[in-house]
Swiss-Prot record:
Species classification: Eukaryota, Viridiplantae, Streptophyta, Embryophyta, Tracheophyta
KW Glycoprotein (keyword) present: no
Record localization: Vacuole membrane
Primary site of residence: membrane
Cytoplasmic side: 1-57, 106-122, 182-240, 286-375
Keyword Ligase: no
Membrane topology: Multi-pass membrane protein
Any Gene Ontology CC annotation: vacuolar membrane
GO biological process: zinc ion transport
Origin superkingdom: Eukaryota
Protein name per the record: Metal tolerance protein B
């Protein structure tokens, strides 16, 4: 049975469960004092090379974005173009997002301490919230200025400088898209190759179809590495942001070209400003949604808690699961707590070990608190 394999396969846990000499009470319960589960998650799952590569790419992107943003701010003032300034504000939101991703990678190596027992993972959420506030503040100032100009219509815009600055931004974003896109497509090629091998093996193991369907419920992650997935998500997110920035720069460049040819059409600059400001504000809504979900301690979006509960009930010795709670400390750092009523004669220690292994291998939950009740 797949279930038996999940409960038995625990190469790292056996050493952890036996290492420090616990008290008799702890031995009877099957609970041994351990280091923070999130610390073990980082050491067990993440790969140093993957982290270093993500850090290098994100740092390079931040540096390039700061260069483009600085040029756009200076050029925006020179051209008296709010559309260029809005483009710079959108870049500011990207820099803030990349800094949060970089902070998340950095914070993952910080150890928990007695006063911060969950570690410093939620700093990522606080940093994201502050970056969103900064974006809304800057966008609000630009929108206010655009409305003032619409009412007065007294400002002139240098279309030539506006076109040149936005063309520079478009070119730099194109370079970043091509650079990140190479890594993005390479990652998907590897994934496709793995999927092809899986199909090939599936044809040679037709008799195991039923067992695999049961495992789908018991092991939905199917061996995915959560840390590597998280690193790839950071890079893919940066790729999508670069694509959006390139499209926005193209829009501003077209607006600059129109004003360059028709200097009186200053309204084009203000329309671009309002449209792209709304675009920048809309881009923060998914971030706010994630922040709200984490602070409200909701079940992670991609997790089916009913399927999780059914999987827990399939573990040997488990009769009833109740008071099941699942929430996130930050993105990808999941905590679980539950009460279990065991079958008569079942070992609490084996149940706890089985639940912990199931949560870790099937859902990437490294911090599970399990209370086995007596009837």
């Amino acid at each position: 049975m797949e279930l038996e394999q999940i409960c038995i396969l625990k190469p790292d846990d056996e050493e952890e469960m036996e290492s420090p000499s616990p008290s008799k009470t702890e031995e009877n319960l099957g609970v041994v004092p351990l280091s923070c589960a999130f610390t073990r998650q980082e050491h067990c799952v993440s790969e140093t090379k993957e982290r270093e590569e993500s850090t290098r790419r994100l740092s390079s992107l931040i540096f390039l974005y700061l260069i483009v943003m600085s040029v756009q701010i200076v050029g925006g003032f020179k051209a008296n173009s709010l559309a260029v300034m809005t483009d710079a504000a959108h870049l500011l939101s990207d820099v803030a997002g990349l800094c949060v991703s970089l902070l998340a990678i950095k914070v993952s190596s910080w150890e928990a301490n007695p006063r911060n027992s969950f570690g410093f993972k939620r700093l990522e959420v606080l940093a994201a919230f502050l970056s969103v506030q900064l974006i809304w503040l800057v966008s609000g100032v630009i929108i206010h200025e655009a409305i003032q100009r619409l009412l007065s219509r007294s400002r002139e815009v240098n279309g030539e400088i506006m076109f040149g600055i936005s063309a520079f931004g478009f070119f730099m974003n194109l370079v970043m898209v091509l650079w990140l896109g190479h890594n993005h497509s390479h990652h998907h090629h590897d994934h496709h190759h793995h999927h092809h091998n899986h199909k090939h093996q599936h044809q040679h193991h037709h008799k195991e179809v039923v067992a695999e369907e049961e495992e789908e419920e018991m092991n939905p992650l199917k061996g995915e590495k959560s840390s590597s997935k998280e690193m790839n998500i950071n890079i893919q997110g940066a790729y999508l942001h670069a694509m959006a920035d390139m499209i926005q720069s193209l829009g501003v460049m077209i607006g600059g070209g129109i004003i360059w040819v028709k200097p009186k059409w200053v309204l084009v600059d203000l329309i671009c400003t309002l449209v792209f400001s709304a675009f920048a504000l809309a881009a923060t809504l998914p971030i706010l949604k994630n922040i709200f979900g984490i602070l409200m301690e909701r079940v992670p979006r991609d997790m089916d808690i009913e399927k999780l509960e059914r999987g827990l009930k399939r573990i040997d010795g488990v009769k009833i699961v109740y008071d099941l709670h699942v929430w996130e400390i930050t993105v990808g750092r999941i905590v679980l707590s539950c009460h279990i009523l065991p079958e008569p004669g079942a070992s609490p220690k084996e149940i706890i070990t089985g639940v912990r292994n199931f949560c870790r291998k099937s859902y990437g939950i490294y911090h599970a608190t399990v209370q086995v009740e007596s009837e």
